[in-house]
């Protein structure tokens, strides 16, 4: 007999103003507790989703995010807690915005493609300029068009980077070292990139021919969905020192944000691995609450193959963002009739939102190697962490939070408390509140475009019909999400940006 909504809620208790705990027993076989971060506005959405699920009694595609946090807590060798961030919403296997870490030294520890997501290393890059809003306003339409012309966008968009099959293998294994060699990146771009733009364990041989076939023509393309390129201006500075380390020194300063991932290649790597892992689960007798949580032991051949293929897809995404940076620099140079160098178009940082990595964390005061799954969440290392660039040693790692189309974005920095509480992880964006299908039914695309224009935002869209899926009404309020993380102490607000021009797939 399924439990009622009130019975479900008896397993969930508030710890602080912004943190809830999910007690063991909420779903079967939980090895650790669950925990999620929400403020009052976001809490309503979380519990509403659970209430609807109790009413429907499991009819429909996705489980509510709270239950997904519980199911992840039942995975073998999970450490501390299964954690949900304020932008959490239901996804495949893991909710998007769910983090989990597994002890690599435990022979039962697993890696799960559902804990990374289909768009491997979907992420965000922020580039600064020395321009001010007043420099851009007179040529804003021209600039939006120039970016749209330079960056291939849309569902079936083909790349403009000439590349053969042999070079493609190199690009999968070398990541940004490849774009540096080919002249698409500046040497210092790599310094300001998570993993320095290259995961060393990548092995192109672990990426199927079908995945390569899908990825090859898409190099340097934006794709559709929630991916975008935005020209933004600095709207507020909360932490002047951190902002100055990032090269942000005034309100109205112009930046470019690029949000994209590994396109069809990453999707295929995930799909291929799920098939293989189902077999490995039968062989190793791994039992999970939800078959979407297909996984393999980290130290098994299947687990290692997935991590190597995932790393190659992650490298592809960094190459992708680097090629788009190259295109954006060209677009700006053309409109302002000067060089990208003279426009000071340096990368502030580049972060990944969907990835699994082996990292060292303190568990009960002892350093442990953990496989941290971050799906729809961002690494946020604290000040003095050895893996962040020299420029940010005193501020903590920059964390880039993209808003939704036409809403503000944020730059945060990592904190020591986040290191201790959430495996140095914080939110990644607004998080969906309406499914894509609901958005298409309820929102008119022309209305969305008109609203953007009324806000003074120039927009270029390859597939206007997809715009309503990404309308601000489809998402949670990004300010609520960021403020919840700030209040919880797992990241700290530095800068707020607002868009003045958007290009979308």
UniProtKB/Swiss-Prot annotation:
Residues the record lists as binding Mn(2+) 1: 119, 122, 227
GO biological-process terms attached to the record: germ cell development; IRE1-mediated unfolded protein response; tRNA splicing, via endonucleolytic cleavage and ligation; vulval development
Cofactor(s) needed for function: Mn(2+)
Protein name as catalogued: RNA-splicing ligase RtcB homolog
Extra information: Ligation probably proceeds through 3 nucleotidyl transfer steps, with 2',3'-cyclic phosphate termini being hydrolyzed to 3'-P termini in a step that precedes 3'-P activation with GMP. In the first nucleotidyl transfer step, RTCB reacts with GTP to form a covalent RTCB-histidine-GMP intermediate with release of PPi; in the second step, the GMP moiety is transferred to the RNA 3'-P; in the third step, the 5'-OH from the opposite RNA strand attacks the activated 3'-P to form a 3',5'-phosphodiester bond and release GMP.
Entry's cofactor comment: Binds 2 manganese ions per subunit.
Its biological purpose: Catalytic subunit of the tRNA-splicing ligase complex that acts by directly joining spliced tRNA halves to mature-sized tRNAs by incorporating the precursor-derived splice junction phosphate into the mature tRNA as a canonical 3',5'-phosphodiester. May act as an RNA ligase with broad substrate specificity, and may function toward other RNAs.
Manganese among keywords: yes
GO cellular component terms given for this protein: cytoplasm; nucleus; tRNA-splicing ligase complex
Keywords, alphabetical: GTP-binding, Ligase, Manganese, Metal-binding, Nucleotide-binding, tRNA processing
InterPro entries recorded: RtcB, RtcB-like_sf, RtcB_euk
Active site: residue positions: 428 (gmp-histidine intermediate)
Amino-acid positions noted as binding GMP in the UniProt annotation, renumbered to this chain: 226-230, 353-354, 402-405, 409, 428-431, 504
Enzyme class, UniProt record, top EC level: ligase
Gene Ontology MF term list: GTP binding; metal ion binding; RNA ligase (ATP) activity; RNA ligase (GTP) activity
